[in-house]
Each structure stands twice: as C-alpha cells, then as structure tokens.
Regions:
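Catalytic core of Fe(II)/2-oxoglutarate
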Residues: 117-118, 123, 132-192
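A short coil-to-beta-strand element that immediately follows conserved catalytic motifs
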Residues: 92-100, 139
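Conserved short histidine dyad/triad with adjacent acidic residue
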Residues: 101-120
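Non-heme Fe(II)/2-oxoglutarate
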Residues: 2-89
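Short catalytic/ligand-binding loop motif for oxyanion handling, primarily in non-cytosolic enzymes
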Residues: 23, 106-110, 173-174
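Short strand-connecting beta-turns/loops that link adjacent beta-strands
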Residues: 19, 106, 179-180
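Acidic interhelical loop/turn segments
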Residues: 94, 104-105, 150
C-alpha cells in the first residue's frame, strides 16, 4: 500500500487507507470506549472559554491516548509513516499528532469552522478517517469544504476513507447526519 496522498487545492482524499479489517477493529475500539464512558460532549471555543453548543457542534469525542488498544497502535504506525512522507515530500515540518474519535448521533453536525483557532498555529494538516460501514449518500454527514462564497465540495464519510487538508484558513463543516457517524479526526502539528 502506498503511503502518500495527492493534494488537489490543499485537500487529499485517499480511499482504502486501511484494510476493512483494520477499520472494523477501530470501530470496535470506538464502541468499547463508548461503553466505558470515555466519550464526552464536544465543546467549542478557546481553552479559556470552552462551551457546549450542540446547535453548532453536536458530536461527542474521545481523545486517543494511552493506554492504546492494538488497532489504535496500528493506526498510529500508519499515520507516522504518512507524517514522515509528508515531511520528506512537502517539507511541512510536522512533529506531533493529536487524534480523537468523533461520534455524531443522527441529526448532529458541525457548523462551518476552521481547525486552527487563534493561538493554535501548530495545527498544519487536518485529517479524518471514516469508520462508517455501509454508508449511503442518503445518510448525509458529508464533510463540506467551502472553496469560494458560492462554491463548495462535499466528501462522503465512507469506511476506510482518509481525508487530509491543509489546516490554516480552511473552512469546512460536517453536514447533519441521518444516522450514527463515526470517525477519527486529528491534526499533524509543528512543534509546540
């Protein structure tokens, strides 16, 4: 499997980034962490003013941190290979990775936003890996990129699909979903 991604206007979409068995194992990890009560309602704002605003952001998340489950270790190894490749090919200076599961119940979405809030310039590449099996377009939940005031691009959340995009200034949203939607989201960062 090739580790690279091909950028088109600062966005890269890579289907089958992981094998279906690996995606299923990560889906099982997410469900296990939910059963353990490790997910919390997502909040918006800066570290000093975090607040829950479900009409803007309706997901719950769980940060991926130690102790890691075996499938999560495999994912981190694959993402490390990608990070090294991006640094070598694109000279991005990426050193760190932060990741979390994002669970959207039916009806939830995330309004238009950027992933690099003020004071967090270290986030350079955003990534989303979808875990949704048997996804159909009627289910909604697409990742929408705003390319211009009157133009956008939607990407379906299909299992095994990895979406990477250059973080600074990139406005995007998660459209409301009509069924449960699970992904792993995160950022490659420069040094803090």
């Amino acid at each position: 499997m090739s580790i690279g991604v091909d950028w088109v206007d600062g966005i890269a979409v890579r289907d089958r980034f992981l094998a279906p068995t690996q995606v299923r194992a990560l889906l099982d990890c997410a469900h296990l962490r939910r059963e353990r009560g490790e997910f919390a309602a997502a909040r918006i704002g800066s570290e000093r003013s975090l607040q829950r605003r479900p009409q803007i952001r309706g997901d719950s998340n769980c940060w991926i941190s130690a102790p890691l489950l075996p499938a999560e270790l495999t994912l981190l190894e694959e993402l490390e290979r990608l990070r090294l490749h991006l640094n070598e090919r694109d000279l991005l200076g990426l050193f760190e990775l932060e990741l979390h599961y994002a669970w959207y119940p039916a009806g939830a979405g995330y309004a238009r936003h950027v992933d690099q809030p003020q004071g967090r310039a270290q986030r350079q590449v955003s990534l989303v890996l979808y875990l949704n099996e048997d996804w159909a377009p009627v289910a909604g939940g697409e990742l929408r990129f705003f390319d211009a005031p009157d133009r956008h691009r939607d990407i379906e959340p299909i299992a095994g699909r990895l979406v990477c995009f250059l973080t600074p200034g990139r406005e995007h949203a998660v459209l409301p979903t009509r069924r449960e939607r699970l992904s792993i989201s995160g950022w490659f960062r420069t040094r803090s």
